[in-house]
Each structure stands twice: as structure tokens, then as C-alpha cells.
Amino acid sequence: FKLVTLTENKIYNKKIAGINLDLNTEQAFKKADVIIDFTVPKCTLDILKIASKLKKRVVIGTTGFTQKEESLIRKFSKKIPILKAGNMSLGVNLLMYLTEIASKSLNDEYLSKVFEVHHKHKKDYPSGTALMLGKGIANGKNKNLYSLVGKKFLNKKFFPYGKKINFNSIRKGEIIGEHEVAFSSGKEIIRLNHEAFDRALYSDGALTAGKWLINKKSGLYSMRDLLNFE
């Protein structure tokens, strides 16, 4: 891999990895084969507009999208290859796969809960990773996530009991990321968990995704496709 450009919407008088920050996004993107995006939803959509115009591949690690924004991303994927993941960690994506298998295997007597802890600076909740895991639970039941949690409960730190999937989000300190999925009945609890110790695992995953995306046709892909999970 070769880092060819960095973009920023503010002016900084310094270099990163020996490269000056470029304020002209479109001009900067012309130098790249793949664009890796870790920003905020509004910026992601702006990036996709330019990438679509330039026919550039995009890896999206941004989270916190609304359903409308998700729909716009799907439209852009008809023009360019896009890989989108709420978490770029290979381990977390394996956790999602195992979550789906567990959900499919267990009957409705088991209550599903997603518990996540992140640093105090993280704004969205439940986190993109927590929602990924929630989708894993829903997929295992052949259901839509939103039908199981209810739209009115999105963007809340705690989902009240009584829903099919319960989320509990905590923001404190400088914790990189802890996630746990629990399936509980009156007789037992099954727990699947993942803890991140180094943020480099996210950049490693994003670079792996970018390399994988190089030879792909237009479409919306996920880490599940990259890892070749069934």
C-alpha cells in the first residue's frame, strides 16, 4: 500500500506520514485507487458524490447513518464498488457471524442482549458495531433489525426490556471498544464477546478491505463478503 493523499476540512500546518493535508478533496481523490473513509455521515455522502464522479472505490468505516442515508449509499453502490462495515476488525466480524449462528440455533425462549462500552468521545449509540451485532441476531431469525427493536428506540443508550433485542451502551474513559452478545433463558446464559486493545486493528482491516475491493465490480459489499462467510 502507498498513502497518496490525505484530506481535511481544516487547515493544519503539519504533515502526516510525510504528506501534506489536501483541502481540495476532488483533486486529492484523483491520485487514489481506493478511498478509505472514517468521518461522519454527512462527509461520507459528500465523499461518495465525488468518488462516484471519478469512478473510485470506497471503503466506509463511518457509523451512525440514518435509514435514508443508508438508502443513498446503496444508490451510489450501483455506480462504484463500496465496502461498508460498522467495524473493520476481522475479529468483530467473526463475532457477528457467530452471533448469527447462535441466534439461528436458539429458540425464542432466549432473550438477546448487546452490551457495548466505548470511550467518552464517541457520539453515536448504539455503536455501529452494536447495530452490526443486532443485525446478526435479526439475520439468525430471518427478521429485519428495525422490526425487532422498534424505530423509536434507536439513538437511545438503553433499550427497555420487553423488546426482542436489548441494547446497553456505555461511554467512559478512553476504552477502545468492548462488545458482548448474550442469549439468556431462565436456565442458562450464553455469552460471545470481543475486546479491542489497539486501534491499529481497524486500520489493518480497512487496508485489507481496500486491497480486496480493487478487483470488484460496482456493488455494496461487507466484511462478510471479504471473509467469505456463508
Where are these regions (language model features)?
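Short, well-ordered coil/turn residues at beta-beta hairpins
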Residues: 38, 61-62, 185
